[in-house]
Structure formats: C-alpha cells, structure tokens
C-alpha cells in the first residue's frame, strides 16, 4: 500500500519594521537583516504505507526549504521504517523528530500558524535526527514514546561530524483523560469542533551530550542550534572570553504541556526548563551551569465553523543572558471549507528573539513587528 501526500505554501514576509541591529549580552552589536520577499517557502512530499504486511510500515519523504537555497540541507530525502506489534508496541528506526516538546510529536503541519513555532518552543526543542524508538499505548488514554538518537538535529550534518556515543535520549508521556484523543494527529486548535470536552496533559524529558561538530548550519532546514538566551550559539569561539572554546555541552530539557478543546475553542500551554552543564573545551573551567526557562500559551476559536479560525498566542523566555517575548495574532481562512487549503495572515510583535533562520519568520535578534501572509496547500 502506498499513500502520497503533498504540502507546500507561498509566503509573503515583511520584516522591515524590526530594528536593523541588536546588542547581545556581551556588549557586541550585531546587524539584523530586514527581509521583504515572496517565497514558495517549502515543498514536502511524503510516501507512506506498508509492505508485504500491514505491520511493516515505511514513511519516506522529500523536503525542500526554498528560502534556504544554497544552505546546508536545503533539500532533504529522509524517513524511517517501523514495525507495529500491536497498539502497545511500535518499534522504529531512521530519521524522525525527537519527542522533546509537543510540536515535535508528529502533528506538523497542523499548527495555528503556518510552519512557524513560537520563539519559546523554537528555542528549547530538539529537531529531526537518526535513531531508534519505541512507542504505543500504556493504557487506553495514556501514550508513551521513547527515542534513542545520535544528536538533537541531524539534518545538514554529515555522519563524519557526529560522535560515536549515541548519547541522546528523549521520552514523552501523553495523557488524554476525557475523550482519549485531541484532534487529528493531536493538532493545535479545534478545527475538528469537538462536541465533548477534549483534554490533554503531557510531559517530555530529553538529554543529549552535544558536540560542536554535530551542530547543523545556522540556516539548515529545521535548525536546532543550542543558543544562549541572547541568540549566541554556545559553541561560538571566544564567546565567554578570549581564548575560550566550548567543544561539548550536556543538554537537559523538560517540558510540560496541557490543553482543552470544545466546540471550536481551544486553550493550550507549555512550560519549558533547560539546563546546560559539563562544558568541555579550551578554558571552559570558569563557565557556570546555565539554566533557562520559558512558556508559551495559545488560544484559538472557529469564528465560522469550517471556514474561519482566529488565534492569539504568546511566549516568553527567561535566562541569565537576557529575556525575550512575543505576541502573535492571526487568522486562517479555509476558503473551500476544508482543511487542505487555507489563507493565513499573522502579525508578530517580538522583543529580542534568540532564534531565527531563513525558513523562520524572523532572524536572530529580531525586535519589532513582523507580518507574513501564507497560502497553504496540504493534502
């Protein structure tokens, strides 16, 4: 059996109202690119199904981030193979998203906005990587996922760059106490229009010993660099002082999320905690452990059932090297009264973003107002 999907969107992006520069926590002034462009931003085509027996599954795809043309991993061919023993146990191997936060549980692209996480989610999460995993139901309304992997983000990273320790682990527990589900693929928002109150609560715990050689490029697709809260990549030479170079760092991260949906309305939140320890490298003995926290909150409502969704979202990040925040207001017009086509408009007011790359609606250091309009196709 073969199942073919196609996802793509055209994006108009206007960053002209953000500041042209910012000063990081070390007093260094850095320039910020103020983009205004139209891009066929992404092309995603998965092939999925089973072979010989419905228990043996494959999920293979081609993924292109056209805003990142010329950058590492602008085009990716990836996927995974799995075997379903029963509803309690599925074992898989290959490339998939680490279950570090809710948005990497596999519901992409069913988010409130188009292909753009809030800055807190983007800052703390892991990404796509090679590994093995086991997942399934512990009980009827309690699901688990455990993955053992090579690093936090493999896309754009050669096998010759990663270490030989397989020292990345990520675990997730998801509880769906009322209805036993939370919409199609666990999507954000309530386009499904639940007639009964749907609820969820989940916890994620992840650990990785990260090496500077195994980090993706700063504009690699699905970039997941380890950054300080001022936006600096932690492996930058001389960042903590002249002659200082971090080679490895221990990353520990936990997130807790919960949400409720009812008749087109949704309220969903997530809290994050990250700790960076055990720095190794040249002159790293004086670097103290780093703890950062943050949260995001997303609310939405179907103003017109099946047609118009409105949403209001926000997030904050708190850390020794600076705090960040944002507010987003948006709408999605499903002009065919189906989920497969929508016209999305989103306004972002951001204060000192510590994350950003070409495929993301804002650059590192963004401070000000951003608007983007997206025509999304997903079938």
Stretch-by-stretch model annotation:
Residues 2-21, 30-154, 161-180, 191, ...:
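Outer membrane beta-barrel
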């Amino acid at each position: 059996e073969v199942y073919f999907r196609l996802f793509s969107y055209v994006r108009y992006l206007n960053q002209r109202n953000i500041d042209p520069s910012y000063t990081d926590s070390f007093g260094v002034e850095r320039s910020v690119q103020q983009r205004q462009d139209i891009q066929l931003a992404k092309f995603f085509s998965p092939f999925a199904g089973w072979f010989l027996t419905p228990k043996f599954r494959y999920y293979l795809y081609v993924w292109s981030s056209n805003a990142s043309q010329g950058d590492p991993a602008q085009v990716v061919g990836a996927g995974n193979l799995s075997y379903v023993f029963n509803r309690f146990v599925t074992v898989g191997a290959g490339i998939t998203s680490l279950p570090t936060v809710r948005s990497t549980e596999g519901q992409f692209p069913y988010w409130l906005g188009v292909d753009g996480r809030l800055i807190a989610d983007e800052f703390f999460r892991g990404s796509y990587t090679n590994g093995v995993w086991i997942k399934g139901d512990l009980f009827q309304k309690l699901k688990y996922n455990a993955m053992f992997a090579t690093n936090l983000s493999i896309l754009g990273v050669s096998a010759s760059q990663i270490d030989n320790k397989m020292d990345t682990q990520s675990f997730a527990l998801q509880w769906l106490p009322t209805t036993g589900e939370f919409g199609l693929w666990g999507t954000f928002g309530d386009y499904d229009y639940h007639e009964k109150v749907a609820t969820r609560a989940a916890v994620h715990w992840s650990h990785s010993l990260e090496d500077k050689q195994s980090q993706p490029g700063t504009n690699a697709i699905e970039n997941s660099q380890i950054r300080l809260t001022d936006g600096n990549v932690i492996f930058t030479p001389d960042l903590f002082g002249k002659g200082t170079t971090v080679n490895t760092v221990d990353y520990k991260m936990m997130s807790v999320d919960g949400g409720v949906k009812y008749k087109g309305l949704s309220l969903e939140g997530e809290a994050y905690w990250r700790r960076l320890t055990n720095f190794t490298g040249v002159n790293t003995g004086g670097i103290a452990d780093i703890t950062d926290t943050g949260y995001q909150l997303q609310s939405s409502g179907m103003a017109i059932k099946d047609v118009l969704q409105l949403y209001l979202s926000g997030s904050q990040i708190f850390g020794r090297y600076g705090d960040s925040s944002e507010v987003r207001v948006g709408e999605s017009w499903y002009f065919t009264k189906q989920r497969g086509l929508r016209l999305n408009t989103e306004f972002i007011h951001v204060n000192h973003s510590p994350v950003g790359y070409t495929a993301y609606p804002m650059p590192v250091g963004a401070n000000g107002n951003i608007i983007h309009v997206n025509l999304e196709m997903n079938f």
